[in-house]
Amino acid sequence: MSIQVLSDVLISQIAAGEVVERPAAALKEILENSLDAGATAIDVELEQGGVKRIRVSDDGVGIPRDELALALTRHATSKIATLADLEQVASLGFRGEALASIASVARVRLTSRHAGSDHAWTIHVDGGPLQPSSPAARSGGTTIDIEDMFFNTPARRKFLKTEATEYAHCAETVRRLALAWPQVAFTLVHNGRAQLRLKAEAAAARVRHVLGEVFEQHAIAVDAAAGALRLSGWVVRPVAATASRDAQHVFVNGRYVRDKLIVHALREAYRDVLHHQLNPAYCLFVELPPEHVDVNVHPAKTEIRFRDSRGVHQFLYHAVERLLAAPVAPAAPPSGPDARPPTFLQPRQAAMSLQVEEAMAFYAPFAAMAPGEGDEARHVPQASAAGLAGRAGPPRAFASDSSAVPPLGYALGQLHGVYVLAQNAHGLVLVDMHAAHERVVYEKLKTALDRRAVPAQALLIPVALTADPREVAEIAPHLDQLREIGFELSITSPNSVAVRAVPSLLKNADPVELTRAILAEIAEFGVARLLAERRNELLATLACHGAVRAHRTLSVPEMNALLREMEATERAGQCNHGRPTWFQLRLDELDAMFMRGR
């Protein structure tokens, strides 16, 4: 075949392969045009998942009669005129090819009444040349009616999924834009049935209506800025993470994006508090000058490039990481005429005779080195002044003034040697003592290593253990580096090692188990990588071995010491594996269980 110039229709059909891969993509382009036109109310009607019909009506400024044909012409746009405009584009659309691409693979009717016009005008195209415009009746704004998607490209139509799947993609498109534009009312109708009605409202209310009550209940508000860069929105506490990524929404200057850099920054921010098989949920809005971000990467405009990608990554990571690190206070108590102040009781278990091997000595290293004390470089958010008062002291009688009670309250006792039960101002607190202590030890190890001052506890008698010759050979050149994290080892033979000292924070752990854990990590990753790239993973492993074990009986003073440590520890709401360390059971929830007040 000889070289020839393609027809405009074929060119548009080829371009449609990138811009309009499914009905949801066409819907996205039309909705963005409505938002760019200043619409305050948008109505969407779908038939057969958008394959049979997509109809979008808005109350925007409308299109003048003499520009209707241009709106359906390739590379015709009102958004930009020069390269300088492209570099500072603030509108959602700007390429001028979406409507032309849609019109090349579907039957399109465009009806619009421009502000100040006596009546509306309409123009239509059936996958070929434009038809002349004619008068029409409608109020101010624009209606775009798309029918028979891919009617003239049957090969493309075969790649579409079921009606339910295509509708789900369309509905998700509407919800995403509704999140970014809460000041705009949206309605969605599918096959004649209303599916979504959102009035113009505040951003928080829109998030609740779109993402649901579970998201709202576990959401933490984000508001951070650095120069011209700003981050706002909500991230969800790790305890509400799921295996799905469906609840991850990021908008840059009002545009929904799927950016690997942003996803990586947020994943890293959650890494220390989230199980590796779960995914965080968030709805975040990034704002920065238009010239600092390139949105002209792909015709679909969901991929972007930042001028200072490293700076954006660091900003997002630190903003979310600091937020997740702050101790989370218990939920606010119920208010209203039925609410009643809590009555605090003296815990009785303090008088019981308990068999505790180490008593308070187990927590002595923690009292001597609390997180953040004397460490100006590492900021530890404080739970409250009351929460840190008298941390090392014995339990006292609960005051009638709930404001004097620490956030996690005071211990009442233990359940099956696994859970600590405590009473605070809001009701009952249940603590997984191993998971909670594991986080406390982990954070203290990180703080000590950051200071390059991990205190070591020498063993009275060195402990010898056999090891694989390859493991022994691997650690031989790195004994000094291991000493930096509190381990003093000596090689006694090609297949044996003597443990002479362990980190003092882990002095109650089994030195053989600790050393074998170290050797296993070294065998898999090597010492250099382990201490550089996987430092936190190593410390998490050590903390797990060093934490108080389940089924060990604690005294009330020990339980209270653990509660105070949790209140002063970053990320105390999750263990090193992302599991929750404590739950709050409010008094009104207990009343509901026993049907009190009914």
Curated annotation (Swiss-Prot):
<dbReference type="InterPro" id="IPR013507">
    <property type="entry name" value="DNA_mismatch_S5_2-like"/>
</dbReference>
<dbReference type="GO" id="GO:0016887">
    <property type="term" value="F:ATP hydrolysis activity"/>
</dbReference>
<dbReference type="InterPro" id="IPR020568">
    <property type="entry name" value="Ribosomal_Su5_D2-typ_SF"/>
</dbReference>
<dbReference type="GO" id="GO:0032300">
    <property type="term" value="C:mismatch repair complex"/>
</dbReference>
<dbReference type="Pfam" id="PF08676">
    <property type="entry name" value="MutL_C"/>
</dbReference>
<dbReference type="GO" id="GO:0005524">
    <property type="term" value="F:ATP binding"/>
</dbReference>
<dbReference type="InterPro" id="IPR042121">
    <property type="entry name" value="MutL_C_regsub"/>
</dbReference>
<keyword id="KW-0227">DNA damage</keyword>
<dbReference type="InterPro" id="IPR014790">
    <property type="entry name" value="MutL_C"/>
</dbReference>
<dbReference type="InterPro" id="IPR036890">
    <property type="entry name" value="HATPase_C_sf"/>
</dbReference>
<dbReference type="InterPro" id="IPR020667">
    <property type="entry name" value="DNA_mismatch_repair_MutL"/>
</dbReference>
<dbReference type="GO" id="GO:0030983">
    <property type="term" value="F:mismatched DNA binding"/>
</dbReference>
<dbReference type="Pfam" id="PF01119">
    <property type="entry name" value="DNA_mis_repair"/>
</dbReference>
<dbReference type="InterPro" id="IPR014762">
    <property type="entry name" value="DNA_mismatch_repair_CS"/>
</dbReference>
<keyword id="KW-0234">DNA repair</keyword>
<comment type="similarity">
    <text>Belongs to the DNA mismatch repair MutL/HexB family.</text>
</comment>
<dbReference type="Pfam" id="PF13589">
    <property type="entry name" value="HATPase_c_3"/>
</dbReference>
<protein>
    <recommendedName>
        <fullName>DNA mismatch repair protein MutL</fullName>
    </recommendedName>
</protein>
<dbReference type="GO" id="GO:0006298">
    <property type="term" value="P:mismatch repair"/>
</dbReference>
<comment type="function">
    <text>This protein is involved in the repair of mismatches in DNA. It is required for dam-dependent methyl-directed DNA mismatch repair. May act as a 'molecular matchmaker', a protein that promotes the formation of a stable complex between two or more DNA-binding proteins in an ATP-dependent manner without itself being part of a final effector complex.</text>
</comment>
<dbReference type="InterPro" id="IPR014721">
    <property type="entry name" value="Ribsml_uS5_D2-typ_fold_subgr"/>
</dbReference>
<dbReference type="InterPro" id="IPR002099">
    <property type="entry name" value="MutL/Mlh/PMS"/>
</dbReference>
<dbReference type="InterPro" id="IPR042120">
    <property type="entry name" value="MutL_C_dimsub"/>
</dbReference>
<dbReference type="GO" id="GO:0140664">
    <property type="term" value="F:ATP-dependent DNA damage sensor activity"/>
</dbReference>
<dbReference type="InterPro" id="IPR037198">
    <property type="entry name" value="MutL_C_sf"/>
</dbReference>
<dbReference type="InterPro" id="IPR038973">
    <property type="entry name" value="MutL/Mlh/Pms-like"/>
</dbReference>
